[in-house]
Amino acid sequence: MATATATDRLSNLKSSVAGLNQISENEKSGFINLVARYLSGEAQHVEWSKIQTPTDEVVVPYDTLAPTPDGSLEIKNLLDKLVVLKLNGGLGTTMGCTGPKSVIEVRDGLTFLDLIVIQIENLNSKYGSNVPLLLMNSFNTHDDTQTIVEKYQNSNIEIHTFNQSQYPRLVVDDFLPLPSKGRTDKDGWYPPGHGSMFPSLSNSGKLDALISQGKEYVFVANSDNLGAIVDLKILNHLVAHKNEYCMEVTPKTLADVKGGTLISYEGRVQLLEIAQVPDEHVGEFKSIEKFKIFNTNNLWVNLKAIKRLVEADALKMEIIPNPKEVDGVKVLQLETAAGAAIRFFDKAIGINVPRSRFLPVKATSDLLLVQSDLYTVENGSVIRNKARTNPENPSIELGPEFKKVSNFLGRFKSIPSIVELDSLKVVGDVWFGTGVILKGKVSIVAKSGVKVEIPDGAVIANKEINGPKDL
């Protein structure tokens, strides 16, 4: 792209963005800076030959961390340095739900948000600490969340909400903002990824307020990761070693081959995402042999370091272009990820944590796992059943009939026992009775127009069912 056209595009964009009164001056300048970086064609690819596997000093094995201090006073002092931040910008639309994803019921009538609040309440009660909860909303979830958090008014935790940035979608043809062309509804805008957490925390005034209260670290996680509970060993390690940033990573399985990984690159620890990998090395990137770990998006970051880097405008994370279409108009969303910020912080590390700290619920197949006898809930934490000897969870594949939460729940009188299950595939018009037990490899595929009802109390082990006759 010729520089002149890039310059013209940018000046046209600036004058259009200046007229968008729905967003703040901070958001306008943040957006213009992001687009300018994108147009300058900053190199996104890495030089493959410079990639090194991180050592145990850089990616610390969890089992080498020092034990948590014994005394409850020491633990209280540790916890009083902590803030928990949940990324709450996503909607439950992919699972057929309206409103924020965090209000989907996970188990025992409790939502993601209920479980998070119970966990922190439990910590604060046990140790007399004051760990606040921050929710970073997007413009899509803000209004609903404000109403939802009222139900926690009587809890012993402070709950704060703030909004991540709101940026205009760019029309690909002329590089002008969609809202300035009359799309003033929500479709004209987008939240620019969780990388915007850092400036948003600062612009909201929350960052300075937390620092003035003596808070030192923020533990950030997706609100749908049920494994992301406060870990005192990790917090203790970071405080003792003055690490400004920590990313929790965990060993890859074949399901995670596209996940970002940590590398050592030119003397710093860096996140490597599949989008940055040159085409000829994508196969190598996906191999579990060379890149053994992936990013859980559980992050621990020092608050003063965030302040220093935001004020210096130093957090220039890799830009992720996300093309979309709105009513036939091709648009572009430029996004950044919080994990990519790792290379800007001093003494940044990864910690290789057990898989139990990564339990995301992205689809109803995940919901089946966490609602089953594979897990129990204790003090808001989802604990895996020790009766399951296989460290990996069964693979679950559910057809489109189960995609929406309401349909999924309607098709199970009760969630089957799956402690001894290896894999399950269910497609078509299938209904489950109560007390069903599934073991080994089970496939239930109802052909079009055929209804399959699994009777109450059925035990199905290593079986393929293609119709009622197979039961």
Swiss-Prot record:
Listed GO CC annotations: cytoplasm
Residues reported to bind UTP: 87-90, 101, 164, 193, 224, 362
Coiled coil (UniProt feature): none
Localization, UniProt: Cytoplasm
Domain of life, source organism: Eukaryota
Annotated keywords: Cytoplasm, Nucleotidyltransferase, Transferase
Amino-acid positions noted as binding substrate in the UniProt annotation, renumbered to this chain: 89-90, 194, 222-224
Keyword Transcription applies: no
E.C. code: 2.7.7.9
Gene3D superfamilies to which the protein is assigned, alphabetical: Hexapeptide repeat proteins, Spore Coat Polysaccharide Biosynthesis Protein SpsA, Chain A
Biological process according to GO: UDP-alpha-D-glucose metabolic process
GO MF entries: UTP:glucose-1-phosphate uridylyltransferase activity
Reactions it catalyzes: alpha-D-glucose 1-phosphate + UTP + H(+) = UDP-alpha-D-glucose + diphosphate
Family indicated by similarity: Belongs to the UDPGP type 1 family.
Protein name, as recorded: UTP--glucose-1-phosphate uridylyltransferase
Species: Astragalus penduliflorus
Organism ancestry: Eukaryota, Viridiplantae, Streptophyta, Embryophyta, Tracheophyta
